């Protein structure tokens, strides 16, 4: 499992012209599920999403986490994130978990984050064509693995 996280001033995800999730200041996390991702890896990624220090402290140093700031978290499933791009001119998706494996893993990640984060956790709709609107703050973007 991997997450491309972006510090945002706001973000929203829309499906069929309806906003299904939106946050103010916080993190947008695009989530790729890989075959065999374990419960332990999912829990570890949730922990990292909530505790990774990418927000400035009083001195402007990246020293505060989402938990510290109480910011929002918007989780969006994105199987293309787990694509094999090592050769050729077209991505391969054998390195991404199939939907029957990926959807429960993504939903588990959402549930864990909602249980542990009081700042609000929103999510896109798994498997849907989504439009993601965001304002990246910084820009600050990191690729996280459990």
Swiss-Prot record:
Gene Ontology terms: biological process: D-amino acid catabolic process
InterPro entries referenced in this protein's UniProt entry, alphabetically: Daa-tRNA_deacyls_DTD, DTD-like_sf
Main location: cytoplasm
Superkingdom in the source lineage: Bacteria
Root EC class: hydrolase
Molecular function via GO: D-tyrosyl-tRNA(Tyr) deacylase activity; Gly-tRNA(Ala) deacylase activity; Ser(Gly)-tRNA(Ala) hydrolase activity; tRNA binding
Pfam families reported for this sequence: Tyr_Deacylase (PF02580)
The entry's keywords: Cytoplasm, Hydrolase, RNA-binding, tRNA-binding
GO CC, any one term: cytoplasm
Subunit details: Homodimer.
Role according to the record: An aminoacyl-tRNA editing enzyme that deacylates mischarged D-aminoacyl-tRNAs. Also deacylates mischarged glycyl-tRNA(Ala), protecting cells against glycine mischarging by AlaRS. Acts via tRNA-based rather than protein-based catalysis; rejects L-amino acids rather than detecting D-amino acids in the active site. By recycling D-aminoacyl-tRNA to D-amino acids and free tRNA molecules, this enzyme counteracts the toxicity associated with the formation of D-aminoacyl-tRNA entities in vivo and helps enforce protein L-homochirality.
PANTHER family: D-AMINOACYL-TRNA DEACYLASE 1, D-TYROSYL-TRNA TYR DEACYLASE
Name this polypeptide is given: D-aminoacyl-tRNA deacylase
Organism: Xanthomonas euvesicatoria pv. vesicatoria (strain 85-10)
């Amino acid at each position: 499992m991997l997450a491309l996280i972006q510090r945002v001033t706001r973000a929203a995800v829309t499906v069929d012209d309806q906003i299904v999730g939106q946050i103010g200041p916080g993190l947008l996390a695009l989530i790729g599920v890989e075959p065999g991702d374990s419960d332990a890896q999912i829990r570890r990624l949730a922990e990292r999403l909530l505790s990774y220090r990418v927000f400035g402290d009083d001195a402007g140093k990246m020293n505060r986490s989402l938990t510290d700031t109480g910011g929002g978290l918007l989780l969006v499933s994105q199987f293309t994130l787990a694509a094999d791009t090592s050769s050729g001119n077209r991505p391969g998706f054998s390195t991404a978990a199939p939907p029957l494996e990926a959807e429960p893993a993504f939903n588990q990640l959402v549930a864990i984050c909602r249980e542990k984060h009081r700042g609000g956790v929103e999510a896109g709709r798994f498997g849907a064509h989504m439009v993601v609107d965001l304002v990246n703050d910084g820009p600050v973007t990191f690729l996280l693995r459990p």
